[in-house]
Amino acid sequence: MTNTTGKINLLGLTQPEMEQFFESIGEKRFRAGQVMKWIHHFGVDDFAAMTNVGKALREKLEASAEIRGPEVVSENISADGTRKWVVRVASGSCVETVYIPQNGRGTLCVSSQAGCALDCSFCSTGKQGFNSDLTSAEIIGQVWIANKSFGTVPAKIDRAITNVVMMGMGEPLLNFDNVVSAMQIMMDDLGYGISKRKVTLSTSGVVPMIDKLAEVIDVSLALSLHAPNDELRNQLVPINKKYPLDMLLAACKRYVAKLGEKRVLTIEYTLLKGVNDQPEHAEQMIALLADVPCKINLIPFNPFPFSGYERPSNNAIRRFQDLLHKAGHNVTVRTTRGDDIDAACGQLVGQVMDRTRRSERYIAVRQLGSEAQEPRAAANRN
C-alpha cells in the first residue's frame, strides 16, 4: 500500500486541490470536475476509462497521478444487513468501515486513524493502541469502496449511502486536516453530494479542535460523553483530564451556536452495567445538559473479550431512558446492529501494526496544546 511511485493520489484531493493540480500540469481548471466525477460518481480508478478526457491528457495523468484507495481485505454481511469492510492502509494496519441500513437510510461509519491514542476504557479500538493517521485518500477511500460495492452513483434519490458518521476507529479531531478534506469531498456535488446535516463528526473532546472545526466546515457534531461527572469521565475517557466537562460543553455550545439553523449536539452515552447506568447518573446528566441544545443517543455496551464491562439489563436501559425523557430530553436507544460480525459500536478493532505502548498513546493529546494545527500540504494526503 505504500506509495513508492511518487505520483499524487487524486482520490484524496478536494475540488480546489484538484484544480491546483491540473494547473500545475498545464491544464485548465475545469478538468478537475471531469476527473472528480469519474472517480467519485462512477468509482473509476483507470484513466483510460475516462472517455471525455483526451488521450494526451490521459497519458499525462498516467505519468503523474494515480487513483488508489485502501486495499479491501474482507467484506462481511450481517444477518441484519449490516456490512463491514476490513481495509489495509499504507502503514500496513487494517481499519474497519461499517454500513448500517435502517428505516430508509444507509449510514456509513468511517475510520479516521489506525488505532486510537485516547484509550477509552470501554472501547476495543483503544485497546489496540495507536499506529497512524489515515490520509484523506484513505478516509474518503472508505466511502469510495462502499459506494462501488453497492454499484451505485450518488444520485439524489435511491442512493445506498445517505449518511456518513466519523465514528469508526480513531479520534477524528486528532487527524484534523485529513478528516476535514475527506468530509469536504463527501459533501461536494463533484464527490458524493451528501448534505451537511447528514455528515457527522464524533469526538471524545479535543476542545481546541472543536473551535477550529467551526471555522472551516459545517457538519453535525456528536460528543462521546459516556459519563455525567468529571470523576467518572476521567476513568472512562482519559482525555477528560485535559479537557474537563465544563470546558468541553462550552466548546460544543459555541460550535452549535455558530452553525445556527436550529442545529443541536448529539450526545453519545455508552451504558455500562453498574458503572454509569444508575438513576443518580441520569439525574447528573439532566443537570449537566440543562442548557445544552442536544439530543441523546444511549448505546448499550457491546461486549468484547477482556473488556471488564457488561451490558445493562433492558430494564435498566429503559429506566435510564425514561428519566431523561421525563426531564424533556429527546432520547433514543441505539439498536445493536452487526454484532454477529463484530461491527457494533465499540467493537471495531482492525489490525493495528507496531502498536504503541500505552504510555505513548497520549503524545498527540499532550502536544496538541491550545493552538490550532497548521494545515498540511496536499501532497501529504496521499
From Swiss-Prot:
Main location class: cytoplasm
Cofactor binding: number and manner: Binds 1 [4Fe-4S] cluster. The cluster is coordinated with 3 cysteines and an exchangeable S-adenosyl-L-methionine.
Q: What does this protein do?
A: Specifically methylates position 2 of adenine 2503 in 23S rRNA and position 2 of adenine 37 in tRNAs. m2A2503 modification seems to play a crucial role in the proofreading step occurring at the peptidyl transferase center and thus would serve to optimize ribosomal fidelity.
Show where the Radical SAM core domain sits.
Answer: 102-340
4Fe-4S found in the keyword field: yes
Q: Which UniProt keywords apply?
A: 4Fe-4S, Cytoplasm, Disulfide bond, Iron, Iron-sulfur, Metal-binding, Methyltransferase, rRNA processing, S-adenosyl-L-methionine, Transferase, tRNA processing
Protein name, entry field: Dual-specificity RNA methyltransferase RlmN
Species source reads Ectopseudomonas mendocina (strain ymp)
GO CC, one annotated term = cytoplasm
Q: Which residues bind [4Fe-4S] cluster?
A: C116, C120, C123
Residues holding S-adenosyl-L-methionine: G170, E171, S202, S224, L225, H226, N302
- Source domain of life is Bacteria
Quote the PROSITE patterns the UniProt record gives: RADICAL_SAM
Q: What else is known?
A: Reaction proceeds by a ping-pong mechanism involving intermediate methylation of a conserved cysteine residue.
Q: Catalysed reaction per UniProt?
A: adenosine(2503) in 23S rRNA + 2 reduced [2Fe-2S]-[ferredoxin] + 2 S-adenosyl-L-methionine = 2-methyladenosine(2503) in 23S rRNA + 5'-deoxyadenosine + L-methionine + 2 oxidized [2Fe-2S]-[ferredoxin] + S-adenosyl-L-homocysteine; adenosine(37) in tRNA + 2 reduced [2Fe-2S]-[ferredoxin] + 2 S-adenosyl-L-methionine = 2-methyladenosine(37) in tRNA + 5'-deoxyadenosine + L-methionine + 2 oxidized [2Fe-2S]-[ferredoxin] + S-adenosyl-L-homocysteine
